[in-house]
């Protein structure tokens, strides 16, 4: 294999693999390097499914990228035999007047003229008999959003990238970088590789390796769990149009998925709890009592028909920035290095669009997308660029 490429992508997970596909599609000589063999269970993309929402409770600024990402997921599905997306619709609910997340979701839908249904508590319960909410709750249902099959997404992008000439170097950890104005070099245990441009998208490992690029941004990885629960298929199955959901209730934010093919309702608790090192994280579900108890607490109150036997659990990681917004930008000192980091537990849905952004930044130094919210020089991060530690 050649040791020089047009672009090297370090970290071939959600964002990196999508970028590799976009580059290879344009005939760019591309090398993707990953410490594992994607798709795998060591990062932030496994667990079968991810929700894609367009009306975005984390900030209406995300909506254009969400819509572009949806277009690209549809395009990917046409190119591959893998199942990529199912339009389940997504339900967002919470206490009326108390949930900032629900309120921002509604404002995002209004500002961008998205198709949605607005519902009150009784209407929610009648439309989805598996859900039990108080009368003082309200909701927004987005029929055109749904569920992505995350591992299939990465698998499809990898197959298509390799078919177009991209090289994927697996089980290879990058140990160091050497950056000059007109070239980049990565050092691995298997040798050195050079390129004109570099994309760094190492997920939780960004927190450990960006310092080698003279960047010490506060990125904190957290342990995150999901559980699959035996549930009443007549109420919670995708076959009867039970939606994906993202809810803000008094004890936190939860997200979940209908049962596909009898797998059980999948539920996660969106929290930044246990700080971890990605190399030493405990990947056993249930090792902490709250792994299951936090999920049970939600099911007991809001979806009792899905509070059955735990069929399986999974452990993955979030990597959080201080403001929970992404970092997608050129390196402040090296215009031939692109950084993608800190997706803070809500990035996967955007990975098709982010891949397009990263490829554009690598090839031209700019992008057609407005990514100002993701600036590496934004106030919430700027002080941290001067060797601040977590």
From Swiss-Prot:
Where does the record say this protein resides?
A: Cytoplasm
Output a single Gene Ontology CC term carried by this record.
cytoplasm
Summarizing activity control, the record says:
Pyrrole-2-carboxylate is a competitive inhibitor. N-(cyclopropyl)glycine (CPG) is a mechanism-based inhibitor and inactivates the enzyme by covalently modifying the flavin.
Q: Residues that bind FAD, according to the entry?
A: 6-36
Question: What cofactor(s) does the depicted protein rely on?
Answer: FAD
Principal location listed in the UniProt entry: cytoplasm
Reaction equation(s) it catalyzes: sarcosine + O2 + H2O = formaldehyde + glycine + H2O2
Q: Which residues carry this modification: S-8alpha-FAD cysteine?
A: 316
- SUPFAM superfamilies given in the database record: FAD-linked reductases, C-terminal domain, FAD/NAD(P)-binding domain
Task: Give the record's family classification.
Answer: Belongs to the MSOX/MTOX family. MSOX subfamily.
Can you state the subunit structure given in the record?
A: Monomer.
**What's this chain's function?**
Catalyzes the oxidative demethylation of sarcosine. Can also oxidize other secondary amino acids such as N-methyl-L-alanine.
Q: Which PANTHER family match?
A: FAD DEPENDENT OXIDOREDUCTASE DOMAIN-CONTAINING PROTEIN, PEROXISOMAL SARCOSINE OXIDASE
NCBIfam families this protein is in? PRK11259.1, soxA_mon
This protein's name:
Monomeric sarcosine oxidase
Organism of this sequence: Bacillus sp. (strain B-0618)
Quick one: which gene encodes this? soxA
